[in-house]
């Protein structure tokens, strides 16, 4: 079974085309006009072993908010579509990732119930032109559209770049684990019989 998706989203604010292969090798081609987000999505693909292509244009002359949030929406939709009925997947994943002085942990449940817990303290600063508060908007949009329960916790860290990079890497590794198919699982990993 091919676990791939291609999603296109066109609004008055953004134009996004995204293709995803869950069972990839970590190849990425990302061009969002938001350099820091490009960096995060490239490492997300690499560390999750997802093949990911993203082309995005947005009203970045205003700010990056719409573009960042809409990419989160589309990535969530693509993951959900590629997983289909979730037959045989592990459902749960978790990863703890160090990045120099930072330690971040992510746990995910592909339950069909969207809920984000975001314990990440960041000063209101920019990395380049990227407002770091937009990271939460991205994760919330991803969570809602994937319909997943996502917990992101940063135990400690000082460098804002390192904090967000550790979060994206931990998310990638947790999703890689949760989306893996296990031959021991008949149907879905739920006593209800549906996720």
From Swiss-Prot:
GO annotation (BP), single: L-histidine biosynthetic process
A matching Pfam family: IGPD
One GO MF term: imidazoleglycerol-phosphate dehydratase activity
Gene Ontology cellular component annotations, sorted alphabetically: cytoplasm
Family: Belongs to the imidazoleglycerol-phosphate dehydratase family.
Protein's pathway: Amino-acid biosynthesis; L-histidine biosynthesis; L-histidine from 5-phospho-alpha-D-ribose 1-diphosphate: step 6/9
Protein name per the record: Imidazoleglycerol-phosphate dehydratase
